[in-house]
A protein has these predicted regions:
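Short beta-strand-centered segments at strand-helix junctions
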Residues: 66-75
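Long, compositionally biased stretches
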Residues: 1-66, 84-139
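Short active-site loop/helix that positions an aromatic residue
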Residues: 75-83
């Protein structure tokens, strides 16, 4: 299937690589299908909406940021997780242009069942998880 993206142009992808968010992502509820695309280099990836070429999020594994989640098993119930090894956790990362910093959204991890490709965003009420990842200096 061909999908259009504003960052990567037209891509030919099989539907077996799609990640299904049955409830969408908060703020983007109408978009249910996404695909993970590699970034040029480093630990980051793009979570690209299949049905809207302009919607894509920078994501990475939280362990890259030195953070690990300890989640009760029932938090994975919405994605029908049978095997703990099938759980992948990603966090969205945004670039704050004003402060030249990267901000991981640790209060909203994305939980993905790698076996059935279902995912959802878990919202955690924990203000202490708000943090700046690093200052980015101009060369």
């Amino acid at each position: 299937m061909q999908i259009e993206t504003s960052r990567f142009g037209t891509l030919e992808l099989g539907e077996d690589v799609f990640i299904h968010f049955p409830w969408g992502i908060p703020g983007f509820g109408a978009l249910k299908r996404y695909v993970l695309l590699e970034h040029r280099s480093g630990p980051f990836q793009w979570l690209q909406a299949v049905d809207d070429p302009t919607v894509a999020f920078v994501v990475c594994a939280p362990h890259v940021l030195g953070y690990r989640y300890s989640l009760p098993s029932e938090k994975a119930d919405p994605i029908e997780l049978d095997q703990p090894d099938d759980l992948a956790v990603l966090v969205m990362v945004c670039f704050d242009r004003e402060n030249k910093s990267l901000r991981p959204h640790l209060r909203g991890p994305l939980l993905l069942n790698a076996s059935n490709r279902k995912a959802y965003q878990l919202v955690i009420d924990a203000p202490e998880l708000d943090q700046v990842l690093e200052k980015v200096e101009k060369p």
